[in-house]
Amino acid sequence: MRLITTLLLLTTLPALAAPPLTTVAEESGFTRTGRYAEVEVLCEAFAARYPTAVRCFDFGTTPQGRPMKALVASTSGALDPLAARRKGLPVVLVQGGIHAGEIDGKDAGFLALRELLEGEAAPGALDRQVLLFVPVFNVDGHERFSAWNRPNQRGPVEMGWRTTAQNLNLNRDYLKAEAPEMQAMLALVNAWDPLAVVDLHATNGAQFEHDIAIMVEPLFAGDPALRTIGQQWRDAVIADLAEQGSLPLPFYPSFVVYDDPASGFTDSVAPPRFSTGYFWMRNRLGMLVETHSWRTYPERVRSTRNTVVSVIEQIAEHGQDWQRAAREADVAASQPDPTPAPLTFAASDKVRTIDFRGYAYTREPSDVSGALMTRYDETTPQLWQVPMRDDVQPAITVPRPGAGYLVPAEHAARVAAKLRLHDLVFHELPAMAQTQVQSFRATSKKFGASPVEGRQTLAVEGEWADETVALGKGALYVPIRQPRSRLVMALLEPRAPDSLLAWGWFNNHFEAKEYMEAYVAEDVAREMLAKDPALREAFEKRLAEDADFAASPAARLDFFYRRHASYDQALDRYPVLRVGSDPR
């Protein structure tokens, strides 16, 4: 009722009373968080209080019909994308509530925004940048409110749910972009082109003293100059947090072996389904902020607020230089590059020992689950010395296409829609006669045993090989020489971890649709053996060396079917092609 009253005052009697800019969280001593109606009220209230410095707007609508609210704040007066570009101001996107149960970012963001506007925090910083604040990304999930949505989290009393109303995890959706909410977010990103994106979370895990983790890319991946900037940005924010009493970490604190502190930690680069794995591919800065769920809600909100303010201070000081480096990275990514492109990353075998602020613990078999369980004593801090592998190197690399990719007409419409979501350049082609291309054929394939985000995934191995094909009118040419060339490869390279192929978009091309009956194959096999001594030798060798093959009638007949003229030569052939020169 109080929120409704506030909204009525805001919309009908603005001259009589200024609406409060405090949150339910603040008023409750940070024991509670407000419902989404509060976000709607506060969004308009900030704009009403600071009409020349704040604008409230909708950037999308959720599947359940709720508005997706954003606030843009800058004391420069640049409150739309065109004005920000004209003034040359860096844009910072701060995103809360992608997992709506981890809602620290909403309340911390409103707190930081108010203090920034009132000059209590980072005075003058909003003159030199534009802050784009999305309090709650997963709006429908936020309204699935319950006290039991995060049983391993200390506060608030009630909170939202991890996934959307369609049960999609938005923090697995940046590249495949299937959720309507993600499509709206990408449109927002394309419009504003933020230099830096800050994704606010609260992590699960073991019990330890460290209260927050700050992870940044580019750091191990991406443009070399931006990698240097990424480390500078991360280290500066961590230093600010430490000065304010936090115990920040520069890596995600998940044990190598679940629930075993002695196993230590491994660092890496997240795939582009995640925010920090996505934005470096756009030549922009991404920061993942993870407060620790075992910390109380007041502690988590405070450390998140401190992070947001530190980010704003760093962008105010360095944003112009960093923005220039990002533009230069766009140019560099558009140039020919003879070096192999990394698709995945992993830590090498190099190990070092680090100090980690944990608690005394025991590991004993559980009489409930039967598993070995770790129990922590939070009254007894303990300095652990644990292994850390953080020498992160490319794991899977592939040669870059000479010019780009060709998407045949039968797949053009839906691939084009995906390319547009990521603001990628492509061209529709007329019919093409015999054209030199590279084609990828899988030598091994593995379908996911269970669905992931509603899809059956596919992992393939294979090689690109030269081939001549004809393409009908309407095929797409996606050039590699464009600023977001890394995103092009992430989507269209078949072995990339979040490619369209990996997410099951082309599974039907890897399913056998035609076959040879066993009684036919028996006779065909005998004819082939009689005509081809080399084939007979190969068959007998396989029988002698492969016991599983020898024991399988189906495998033995398939040996001959695959070598027969009736075999489907298009099976296991990836329909997207590579091309070495511009086909236009």
PLM features per residue range, with description:
Residues 1-9:
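Sec-dependent signal peptide recognition
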Residues 12-14:
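N-terminal signal peptide c-region/cleavage motif recognized by signal peptidases
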Residues 18-584:
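Structured catalytic-domain cores with a bias toward divalent-metal coordination
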